[in-house]
Amino acid sequence: MGRGRGGYTEKQPSYKDSGGHKVTDKGAIFVAERYMDQGYEAVFRRRHDPDRGCDLTIKTSDDENIVKNIEVKAITSNNPSKISTRIGEAAGQISEGDTVAIFFPNHRNSQTGRTLAEAGIAEARRKGYVKGPIEVWFSDKTCEHY
C-alpha cells in the first residue's frame, strides 16, 4: 500500500510560479483555483524574486488583459488584532490599488466568519494598514468583498 490512508481519488495538480518553482502556498492556490473556475487565467508570481509585488496576477481568459494583482494571506487566528496584522503584512507587499485577499481555511461563510473578518478588516483600516480592496475567501469557496 504505502500511499497513506485513503489514497487519492484524483491526481492533485502541481502549480509552478513564473520562475519555475513549485507553488506551495495553499491560500494562493485556493484563490487561484476559484478564479480559474470563473474562467480567468491565474499567474503565480515568483516567490524568490524580492520585487515580485504580489502572489497572483489574474488575467482574462485570452491572457491579454490583467484584471487584478492579488496578495493572499491564509489566516487561522480568531483574534481580530492578528487578522489586521496579517492584512497589513499583505498590504505592505503590494502596490496601491492592488487587492489583498485573506483566506480563512477554518471558517465557512457564516455570520461568525463574516463578523470575524469584518472586525479584522475594520481594525486594519483604522490603523491605516490598507486602503484598497479586500477579498475574504472562506473554506466553502465563497467570497465577500470589502
Question: What are these regions, as identified by a protein language model?
Answer:
Residues G2-C54, K68, V72-Y146:
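Charged, structured surface patches that assemble and position nucleic-acid processing machinery
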